[in-house]
């Protein structure tokens, strides 16, 4: 065999090997920015994402969430209203047209408290995002029942801290604090009762399960706002006499025990008192979450899941617990616990921002894979209450809204008729907005969805199928090589057969 023939044969073999490797090796894709371009709305950052610090995409997420809250306003709107498709509404009580225009103070107050708490902890995030004024406007715009009175007192006390310490508005802070004190006094001096017993109409919507957690919660926030130890004494007394220790209930608008553990630990540490009891309470609660000993678990995709609570709005327990973990992490009793709580919180943030089996960021308006059909009448733009699919396409983008979220199998139905998965709510965005402020301060990279190409992933090929493909390709390659080496004999055999 001459050298030219040998080189030719080697070239064919090399080509065959390269072809096989290309079949077996997935093509890598250069990273691109797949986030949707921002709308031309005042206050929405326009700078594209570039992994810089401070990160413009996290700034947008904070701005979008604040925009979402503006879209929820009703009544006589201010002249600086940024939501072009929202107009004055609900100027009367709706009775003359048969509409129920009820507002629910209980979950609204919790929302304000959590946003204020997050802003007190991570105010720098709002400053870096240039959203402090919009935060102020949002918090500023905000019947007998022990639970509601205690929660509303907490909201006003927390807001008073924000206006005093961050916005330098002592006058308004004092007004809020006066209302907070009066509400808490009202909660304590009237007969203890759940508010749905006084207002039965709310029972089917946002009923309360207890009120002692709100009495502790409200007293703690009043202590933080006033430094009056009588409020701390009240909180400790209500806590000790009403069996609130060691509970494993999910922190949300109805249940404050988890938040009380963390806030107790914070306040005792900040005041220089012995905080060991309260850190023990907080860490028992948070360890139960991250170690799955609280009765909850994780979906295959990594979403924190609690049967019952998560069935109604799956992202709610995830975001609420992530919020508490990041609030408490800096004062944990060990660096290992600090890192564990932070890692848990970041995993839930990533899931919500697209690191999930269907590559869906559950924030409206940030990515082509974002939910397109939130269960929201104003954004839908229709006028037929009996038909939520008329028109079929959502008319307005509800930027920043967090939807209910996927099911236990990480599947998501992007249909406005599936209100469990696509409904939006004030309390869904409260922990999310605070978490984005945390990320604005601490993250040096883009949100996960920025590098996620549009489209949902195809089903993954199993390991067995991959092995089978490899074996088949190798066999085909061997056959091709043998056929090449025996080509003369094959040609001669074929020639003889035809004769």
Tell me what each language-model feature is.
Residues 497-499:
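Non-transmembrane, juxtamembrane loop and terminal tail segments
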Residues 248-252:
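Zinc-dependent metallopeptidase catalytic helix centered on the HExxH motif
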Residues 33-121, 133, 141-162, 202-244, ...:
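Aromatic (Trp/Tyr) and acidic
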Residues 462-480:
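Single-pass type I membrane protein transmembrane segment
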Residues 1-8:
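N-terminal secretory signal peptides that target proteins for export/translocation
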Residues 8-30:
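Cleavable N-terminal signal peptides of Sec/SRP-targeted secreted and luminal proteins
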Residues 143-183, 190:
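A conserved hydrophobic secondary-structure block that centers on an alpha-helix together
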Residues 169-223:
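Internal metal/ion-chelating core segments
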């Amino acid at each position: 065999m001459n050298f030219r023939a040998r080189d030719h044969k080697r070239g064919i073999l090399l080509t065959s090997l390269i072809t096989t490797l290309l079949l077996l090796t997935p093509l890598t894709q250069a990273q691109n920015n797949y986030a949707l371009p921002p709308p031309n709305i005042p206050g929405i950052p326009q700078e594209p994402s570039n992994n810089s610090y401070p990160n413009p995409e996290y700034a947008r997420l904070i701005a979008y969430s604040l925009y979402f809250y503006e879209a929820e306003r009703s009544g006589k709107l201010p002249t600086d209203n940024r939501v072009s498709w929202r107009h004055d509404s609900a100027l009367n009580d709706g009775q003359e047209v048969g509409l129920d225009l009820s507002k629910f103070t209980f979950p609204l107050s919790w929302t304000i408290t959590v946003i204020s708490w997050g802003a007190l902890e991570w105010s720098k995030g709002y400053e870096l995002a240039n959203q402090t004024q919009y935060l102020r406007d949002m918090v500023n715009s905000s019947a007998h029942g022990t639970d509601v009175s205690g929660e509303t007192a907490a909201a006003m006390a927390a807001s008073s801290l924000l206006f005093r310490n961050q916005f330098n508005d002592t006058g308004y802070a004092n007004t809020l604090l006066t209302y907070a004190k009066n509400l808490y006094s009202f909660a304590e001096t009237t007969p203890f009762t759940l508010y749905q017993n006084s207002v039965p109409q709310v029972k089917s919507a946002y009923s309360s399960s207890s009120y002692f957690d709100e009495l502790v919660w409200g007293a703690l926030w009043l202590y933080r706002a006033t430094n009056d130890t009588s409020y701390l004494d009240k909180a400790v007394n209500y806590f000790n006499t009403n069996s609130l220790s060691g509970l494993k209930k999910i922190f949300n608008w109805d249940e404050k025990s988890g938040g009380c553990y963390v806030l107790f630990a914070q306040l005792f540490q900040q005041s220089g008192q012995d905080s060991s009891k309260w850190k023990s309470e907080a860490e028992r609660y948070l360890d139960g979450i991250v170690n799955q000993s609280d009765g909850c678990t994780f979906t295959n995709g990594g979403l924190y899941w609690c049967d019952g609570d998560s069935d109604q709005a799956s992202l709610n327990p995830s975001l609420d617990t992530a919020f508490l973990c990041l609030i408490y992490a800096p004062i944990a009793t060990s660096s290992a616990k600090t890192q564990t709580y932070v890692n848990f919180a970041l995993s839930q943030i990533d899931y919500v921002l697209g690191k999930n089996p269907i590559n869906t960021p559950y924030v409206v308006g940030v990515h082509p894979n974002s939910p397109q059909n939130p269960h929201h009448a104003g954004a839908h733009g229709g006028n037929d209450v009996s038909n939520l699919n008329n028109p079929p396409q959502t008319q307005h983008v509800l930027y920043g809204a967090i939807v209910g979220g996927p099911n236990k199998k990480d599947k998501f139905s992007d249909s406005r008729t599936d209100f469990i998965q696509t409904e939006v709510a004030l309390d869904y965005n409260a922990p999310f907005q605070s978490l984005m402020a945390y990320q604005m301060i601490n993250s040096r990279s883009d949100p996960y969805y920025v590098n996620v190409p549009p489209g949902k992933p195809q089903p993954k090929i199993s390991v067995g199928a991959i092995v089978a493909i490899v074996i088949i390709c190798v066999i085909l390659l061997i056959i091709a090589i043998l056929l090449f080496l025996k080509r003369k004999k094959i040609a001669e055999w074929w020639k003889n057969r035809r004769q």
